[in-house]
Curated annotation (Swiss-Prot):
The lineage of its organism: Eukaryota, Metazoa, Chordata, Craniata, Vertebrata. It comes from Bos taurus (Bovine). Its main location: membrane. The modification N-acetylthreonine is found at residue 2. Keywords: Acetylation, Cell membrane, Coated pit, Endocytosis, Membrane, Phosphoprotein, Protein transport, Transport. This is AP-2 complex subunit beta.
Amino acid sequence: MTDSKYFTTNKKGEIFELKAELNNEKKEKRKEAVKKVIAAMTVGKDVSSLFPDVVNCMQTDNLELKKLVYLYLMNYAKSQPDMAIMAVNSFVKDCEDPNPLIRALAVRTMGCIRVDKITEYLCEPLRKCLKDEDPYVRKTAAVCVAKLHDINAQMVEDQGFLDSLRDLIADSNPMVVANAVAALSEISESHPNSNLLDLNPQNINKLLTALNECTEWGQIFILDCLSNYNPKDDREAQSICERVTPRLSHANSAVVLSAVKVLMKFLELLPKESDYYNMLLKKLAPPLVTLLSGEPEVQYVALRNINLIVQKRPEILKQEIKVFFVKYNDPIYVKLEKLDIMIRLASQANIAQVLAELKEYATEVDVDFVRKAVRAIGRCAIKVEQSAERCVSTLLDLIQTKVNYVVQEAIVVIRDIFRKYPNKYESIIATLCENLDSLDEPDARAAMIWIVGEYAERIDNADELLESFLEGFHDESTQVQLTLLTAIVKLFLKKPSETQELVQQVLSLATQDSDNPDLRDRGYIYWRLLSTDPVTAKEVVLSEKPLISEETDLIEPTLLDELICHIGSLASVYHKPPNAFVEGSHGIHRKHLPIHHGSTDAGDSPVGTTTATNLEQPQVIPSQGDLLGDLLNLDLGPPVNVPQVSSMQMGAVDLLGGGLDSLVGQSFIPSSVPATFAPSPTPAVVSSGLNDLFELSTGIGMAPGGYVAPKAVWLPAVKAKGLEISGTFTHRQGHIYMEMNFTNKALQHMTDFAIQFNKNSFGVIPSTPLAIHTPLMPNQSIDVSLPLNTLGPVMKMEPLNNLQVAVKNNIDVFYFSCLIPLNVLFVEDGKMERQVFLATWKDIPNENELQFQIKECHLNADTVSSKLQNNNVYTIAKRNVEGQDMLYQSLKLTNGIWILAELRIQPGNPNYTLSLKCRAPEVSQYIYQVYDSILKN
């Protein structure tokens, strides 16, 4: 009977029986009992109470039983750290066992037990195993070093294990070399500035030698390591490429992709005119094509990587377009990827084949695939000018099929073709107008309206067509409403005498009957333009439009170079850099392609070093200026020196969906603000009675837990078409977060959320896009924690801590204001030295000192100091003068502004006196509000 019998028991109270069996004298009985325990553990039963009994079974020569006991230990050691110590002696003993399998098993298990108390006992056995005579033990010990480093990095460095790992790179056994490289690479990821691997020509030669004899996963580790090396010149790059090229014919697709990554990177260093360069390009094509004969899942990963390769070097696969033709039994995700690559490889030479394929695809039954195929025909027309006429003819044939979704997608595509080739294919407009009644999708309706408005002078009944859309104006989507408004204004400017009533009707609907601010504002712009200067209006609205680009979905070059360095990893499948989706990856080293002529440090300089130094200097805050003007200048791309956010992530989202011109006239109305942070009365200016600080005692230690303001409703549902947003701000582990709750009180689901901040006093911006990946259903709420940073554009606001926010979803764009409690902007390095504090206090002019009263506070000086230190307000010194406690404190804001404080506490008096001094006195009243909130919380 198989081991499945252990999973079929339904007995109650079996723990007692298992305990007895584990202590049985017979070895077979104990082995059976341990198997039952492991089975119970596997199905989720709590068998932690058997810990001492299972540990007793470690003293055995039976390898199978030992493995089972070790498995149990790994699972329960974290919850029973004190009892896990019992097993240490057995581990140490097993590390010296004659059997290398047992030695390796022991050191591997000790590395998997993530308990601090055990790590100190692991050092000596691990040191022996790293020098063990058996390669199996050495390779296991190498991985154990990486695991131990993750638990206690300092101890690994102090014990010299990193040096031992480096020594293993020269080991005679290739698997030991591979594991040593894997361990060092893993450690390097968390310490990007350390040169742990010390890659030099000698080490590279050792790795290339080991590459031929490794297992497939060992080869992947070594190839990934090689991809991080920057050869000193093109000769060395060519030499490495020659030794890596045989890996392209490996059976394992992961090895192939790792080899492709190395070659793609080193191609940058080879002279393009050389014969070897062209030969290497030819060698890269067959293995990539071979990957497409695997399982669908492997095909998908390969296609996502090929998509990047084609964008970087289309010449590699330009002759292989046929392998990307879709097969009838391909899954939809493979079909869509193949379609994308086909368009990227389309050229004048192969466009006839591509169009024939696409026309065939447009008759398939899968709606999503058909839509993408029709869109692809349009992309071909835009990309290959010589094929445009043939593409338009193909689209007209598809429109004649009268298949609803095909017709609608074709009209959207034809609009783009009109934009690319103005005044060339307008003869087909009559055919398009025949299908007006069948259009029910917003994109298609908007496209048709745009065509009618743009070519109104060529359509006899353009006014009737647009008027038919106007009948259900309020039922249309925002996209259609905005397009219709613009189209009718265009029509009026072309035929003013015939359409005056129509334009007045649409302007009235847009400005008076609509509650959509984008639509209202665009309506007012047109109204004012038409009423003040019709000539200028004509120049603005009917101006010549820029031609649309060939490829609108190309990845931004810098990001593409980084993704090429991550071929074969998740980043290449997501088309996002690792720090965009790996939690806690702020320290991940950004990779870059090397620069030609072998600049050795091209890929080694960490990104963002200038940012760190610039943050130390206080930022100059410009005046607030015109709010509307600044809203027009909202930067929809990412902050240029924020390494955590890629340009594709934030740059791809345009919150102002109706276009930037829709914001003119839009005002932000602050929502209700908690009274806690209401502006205080203007404080009195006083002089200080500060004396010599050198006699003062030291501050108080820190206790956990900073102040978090209570959540407030920032955006009521009545003002946001059913979307309610409440929230607050927090400061955790050195990072600022915007904690929000989104509630859908509407009758329809909400999707496509995005967020944008206006310029503000402290440069606060989101570090990552808003992460709401699933639709928000009616009456559903979701909590979102949005990481923030202070590297954005700066503009002085009134009040100073005011933050203006735009939130977009599939319904509309909504605006609200909230106040940032300044304690979330207090940084961890805000503690001054006492001498510096005294000198700074004296250096700041007396007129910058402001005094406040904190009323009804019943805390002693130690508690006050502790509460404030939890919020990064540091007590520099404390003394008692005539029974009155005096606390001298410092804090620092994210923009580099220092604030010095003197807090006087009289025992028995609930009113405290707070004196604040800083070089930007307008900040002081907000600091007082924070003090008041923290101490009364």
